[in-house]
A protein has these predicted regions:
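Membrane-interfacial terminal anchoring regions of lipid-handling membrane enzymes
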Residues: 1-631
Length: 631
């Protein structure tokens, strides 16, 4: 039974109130209101709140993170927490309530410590029983004792046994931006703490600086009622420990999905490649075979690594994202993104490294997926780019943004091939996501080009050599109403030689800013979980001959392209273009074109073809497409 207490016993330091317009809170609200949460998370929390009580669980015992959840839930119309266990929120209470808390606190000083604690726990349990949401703090790790967390979970278990509604504990990731953690400790980190275990001062400074990049991600909730039924034969102490560990683990999974693993520097990754045992053996064997000094072969390997390796820097990514946001708004009419597909990518990224394999239509592809992943709170991949894109300044910018460069052809150069293969293997070993274009170059016609399976074979070989336990190959469709290279593509299809990419071309292409290129479409295919896929083959890859392995790589390449085709869409522009091209005379009336387009649409519908989301308003979509043609 939950104890009843007198009037003063309802004022505690952790209390939060449904008043956010008092003067002390308003300046903080300027920064707090910048914190974002995706609409799909808001919808899922609203649905969850109709089924039972929501308890928000965060890792650090942080007043700031408690305030972020407090303001965000108020702004989004979600269940507002009325209590933050273990955090002193008295400064953020309205003045009358703060004065009452101070008086109650003064009176409690004359009580025995144990009685005061029991009163506080009874208040918290009463709050839970009244179906009022609260915030609990889990601590940094399940292996580090947290009496506050154990008290909160114990109280939740007690209340769950007394009420007729389920309690949902929602683990919440609160992050102030997308910066990856570095393995090397800087002086700043030594003084103020790493991003994860930071002190109060650095947390506040970091939040103020990056508040416009801060976000909240609720992880998969735990239904406490179901959890207790599943673990009814275990000791409560064990249940509390394991439940706390599970909640912390779910927050860590979300963090990994967004930020990725701790990142080593370019030099450290290169050192790992050169010190790899199979790499060292290759260098020794190749030196003997080619009758060269081992030092010479190792020097060549290091030189190739410098040519290949990415040099990821957060600052460049942050600047680049701002430029790309402006570019998309200037050149395109919006991005149509497969949010369900992106959720699949997020779920995969929590469990294993993943390899994004998109079709290739435009140089914009290099930038687009990284931008979409950033905005979708998914860790950005390291992108395999051709050396044709390594010209200054774009090559420098791409390399700093996570691109690594490879030659179009390196047949006969065994050292280069081994270095590239081992670099990819080390990236996978570090749990870093990759991206490469299976067609090799850009398709000039919009149709899929025959797959090139060189990089795919290197990635599968890295898995086979145990550099990673598993990985997912994720096919991605990227479609454009118009590509910015349309003029050069027409020239090439008419017989003109391909012009090599250079700085002058970038300057000349500035006139694209005067045009609109319609929408961009991104759809995610079904991920191929490579371990399961390879185990399902009649013959295991270890038992295959070289020819059989190459045949398998080709098969996987074609299956990836088939999956990309499955999720490709008919766009309004492509439908209108087909209608215009089907007409054999020079001019066509609007009514006649409309009849043709309706006929095409009905035919494609009967064939179960996927249409772009913009077809939800078909007449407007076709009108917009016609406007692009008459620019």
């Amino acid at each position: 039974m939950i104890m009843e207490h007198d009037h003063d016993e309802k004022y505690y330091s952790g209390c939060l109130y449904d008043k956010q317009n008092f003067w002390r809170f308003l300046p903080a609200k300027i920064f707090l209101s910048r914190v974002s949460i995706a609409d799909e998370y808001v919808d899922s929390l609203r649905k969850l709140s109709k089924k039972g009580l929501i308890i928000y669980a965060i890792k650090q015992r942080s007043k700031l993170n408690s305030l972020i959840i407090y303001e965000l839930t108020g702004r989004k119309g979600l269940p507002l927490p009325v209590y933050s266990h273990g955090a002193n929120m008295s400064f953020w209470q309205p003045l009358p309530e703060m004065v009452k808390f101070l008086w109650s606190s003064f009176l409690r000083r004359f009580q025995k410590k144990q009685k005061a604690l029991l009163g506080k726990l009874a208040f918290m349990e009463r709050t839970f029983a009244e179906k009022s949401s609260s915030i609990i703090h889990l601590g940094e790790s399940e292996f580090i004792e947290s009496r506050s967390a154990d008290q909160a979970i114990s109280s939740l278990i007690k209340v769950q046994g007394m009420v007729d509604f389920p309690i949902f504990i929602v683990p919440v990731l609160v992050a102030y931006g997308r910066r990856r953690e570095n393995e090397n400790e800087s002086l700043i980190n030594i003084l103020f703490g790493q991003a994860e275990q930071t002190g109060t001062l650095r947390r506040v400074i970091t939040f103020i600086r990056y508040s416009n990049q801060a976000y909240v991600i609720p992880a998969e909730p735990i239904n406490l009622s179901s959890y207790l039924k599943e673990n009814k034969d275990r000791l409560q102490e064990t249940i509390i420990h394991d439940l706390r560990g599970e909640l912390i683990g779910r927050i860590e999974e979300e963090k990994t999905a967004v930020i990725g693993p701790a990142l080593k520097s370019k030099e450290e990754l290169m050192g790992m490649v050169l010190s790899d045992e199979t790499m060292k053996k290759f260098i020794t064997d190749f030196a003997v075979k080619s009758k060269k000094d081992r030092v010479v072969v190792e020097r060549d390997a290091r030189r190739y690594l410098y040519e290949i390796a990415a040099d990821y820097k957060e600052t460049f990514v942050e600047i680049w994202i701002k430029i790309l946001t402006w570019l998309w708004n200037t050149v395109y009419d919006g991005l149509s993104i497969d949010h369900e597909g992106m959720a699949k990518v997020r779920n995969v990224s929590k469990k294993m490294p993943f390899v994004i394999i998109p079709c290739h239509r435009s140089h914009i592809d290099y930038l687009l997926l990284s931008y979409v992943f950033f905005k979708s709170n998914i860790q950005m991949p390291f992108i395999a780019a051709g050396t044709n894109m390594s010209f200054f300044p774009m090559g420098y910018i791409f390399r700093k943004s996570g691109a690594f460069f490879l030659r179009r052809s390196f047949r006969g150069n065994e050292v280069y091939a081994e270095v590239l293969s081992k670099y990819i293997a080390i990236l996978l070993q570090e749990g870093l996501p990759l991206e490469f274009f299976i067609e090799g170059g850009r398709s000039r016609t919009g149709k899929m080009v025959m797959p090139k399976y060189g990089l795919l074979s290197m990635i599968i070989q890295a898995y086979q050599e145990k550099y990673c336990d598993n990985f997912a190959a994720i096919p991605v469709y990227i479609g454009y109403d118009r590509v910015i290279e349309e003029k050069s593509y027409l020239d090439e299809l008419s017989g003109a030689p391909k012009v090599r990419e250079n700085t002058a071309q970038i300057i000349k292409s500035s006139n694209i800013l005067r045009k609109r290129y319609g929408r961009v479409y991104i759809n995610i295919g079904e991920p191929i979980i490579m371990k399961s896929y390879l185990e399902s083959q009649e013959k295991q890859i270890e038992q295959m001959t070289l020819e059989e392995r190459q045949s398998l790589y080709r098969k996987i390449g074609y299956e990836i392209e088939l999956e990309i085709n499955k999720v490709s869409v008919v766009t309004p522009i492509s439908l209108v273009a087909s209608g215009l091209l089907s007409h054999d005379r020079r001019g066509i009336s609007h009514d006649e074109l409309t009849d043709i387009l309706n006929e095409f649409y009905e035919y494609l519908s009967t064939r179960k073809v996927k249409f772009a989301a913009t077809f939800a308003h078909r007449e407007r979509a076709i009108a917009d497409a016609l406007n692009i043609f008459v620019q």
